[in-house]
Amino acid sequence: MSHSVEYIIQHIPPVDTSLAGAAQAHLDNLTKPRGSLGRLEELALRLYCIQGGDTPLAADPARIYTIAGDHGVAAEGVSPFPQEVTRQMVLNFLSNGAGINVLCNTVGCEQFVVDAGSCGGAYPEHPRLIQRKIHPGTASIAQGPAMTAEQCRQALQLGIDLAGMAREAGCRTVGTGEMGISNTTPSTALYCAYLGLDPAGITGPGAGITPDLVKHKTDIIRRALAVNAGAVQSQNAVDILAALGGYEIAALTGLILGAAYHRMAVLVDGFISTAAWTAAWKICPAVSDYSFFSHASAEAGHKTALRSMGIEPLHDLGLRLGEGTGAALTLFLLRSAAAIFNDMATFSSAGVATQSSC
């Protein structure tokens, strides 16, 4: 049985950082110059702490959830794509035709598709589809709150339930992914509300709009922040999420909170996933202990948002697709870090002299 949103938030354990010394000592005793494997060593150390010092380290089993939702703000003309593309892409995911499918198949990672709030009716049943539609699309953030408080709570609970399902399946790692036409607009609004950023500095082309439409999109975000000023000024993280977010964004927030509660590593994807993570971090800062930021998105504003939170992502390949693609690529790095910790020989076991013994 899944725990409630309130219970999860109150019981997320910080990692035991006192274990870091033992992890570092082991890494320093492997047959290499100290620190020569760079950030892979940092990943291994963090995995060791997340897993409570249990060895061997494990990044697998891993699962990526690609969560779909539609947005009322699409009616404001902030995307070049019609809203029905969200539904079409859900079907594409289920047919293994999308970028996330190819990458998950390549790296050997399980992927589930979740309908949190796409427009239209139910989808045909599919073994990789979880249908938990809260409502067919949010209200427009340019006109008022995207969700009611209860709808936001349901979306958070959905994400928490997804984390619980992954843990019951034995997963050690979950990755975040999403699909929703116009969802860069609410994500940008969330960054502005949570981090005090200016829309003009972080609003980008999303799926490919013209400079004139970027200006229009910026104006829409400013309007959304003004219309929802009460929630923004309250600095209540959940109220802000309800006012400016989306069903898939709030579900990802719940997924991140739930994964941290279950002591799983979280691979955070790109621009939209990081907005969801920012909400989770504002709700419970301990989620940062479990989170690995896969990449710096090419979407304008992602690097600015990451920098404002002191976060250095693991790679920058110019990705801006979403879906969980960056998380899938980064799983290999997490696996590699675990393998280095588990399988490399120590100086003594390999009979290799250390620098101090030469």
Curated annotation (Swiss-Prot):
Pathway(s) served: Nucleoside biosynthesis; alpha-ribazole biosynthesis; alpha-ribazole from 5,6-dimethylbenzimidazole: step 1/2
E.C. numbers: 2.4.2.21
GO biological process: cobalamin biosynthetic process
Entry keyword Nucleotidyltransferase: no
Active site per UniProt: 323 (proton acceptor)
PANTHER family, per the entry: NICOTINATE-NUCLEOTIDE--DIMETHYLBENZIMIDAZOLE PHOSPHORIBOSYLTRANSFERASE
Cited function: Catalyzes the synthesis of alpha-ribazole-5'-phosphate from nicotinate mononucleotide (NAMN) and 5,6-dimethylbenzimidazole (DMB).
Protein name: Nicotinate-nucleotide--dimethylbenzimidazole phosphoribosyltransferase
